[in-house]
């Protein structure tokens, strides 16, 4: 209702800052301070593993989370924009944080599992360049809008 709509902005801001503070030890935070409803990490802090933002995004799929916007803004080489919604429960947000910590740990102990993700999806990692140059939308098993 009318009273609850006033909480949309503050809740989105609270959620974003909570996630940022919880993950800043594992992920590089290029801009310090309070954020609004979104913030950007610049990949993992430990760059020695060779695990990229794309790898982290694909690994999130294995854990049932939609990958965030990646490689935007172009200001940062390994940008990962985290933009939690205002209506996520604390349990859901804590689950996301736990998975992000786990992926950071996997990157240190078994980087190949992160680099090879996703493992649990029907379609594995897509060759983005080939898909852009030679799309085969007719191969899709879902015949919507074709």
Sequence positions of predicted segments:
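Non-catalytic terminal extensions of PLP-dependent enzymes
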Residues: 2-146
């Amino acid at each position: 209702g009318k009273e609850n709509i006033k909480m949309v902005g503050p809740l989105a801001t609270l959620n974003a800052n909570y996630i940022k503070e919880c993950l800043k030890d594992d992920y590089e935070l290029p801009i310090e301070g309070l954020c609004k409803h979104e913030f950007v990490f610049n990949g993992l802090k430990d760059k020695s593993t060779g695990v990229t933002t794309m790898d982290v995004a694909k690994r999130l799929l294995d854990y049932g989370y939609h990958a965030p916007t990646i490689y935007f803004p172009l200001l940062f080489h390994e940008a990962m924009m985290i933009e939690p919604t205002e209506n996520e429960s604390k349990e859901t947000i804590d689950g996301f944080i736990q998975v992000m910590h786990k992926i950071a740990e996997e990157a240190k102990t078994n980087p190949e599992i992160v680099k090879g993700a996703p493992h649990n999806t029907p379609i594995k990692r897509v060759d983005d360049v080939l898909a852009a140059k030679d799309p085969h939308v007719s191969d899709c098993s879902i015949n919507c809008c074709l």
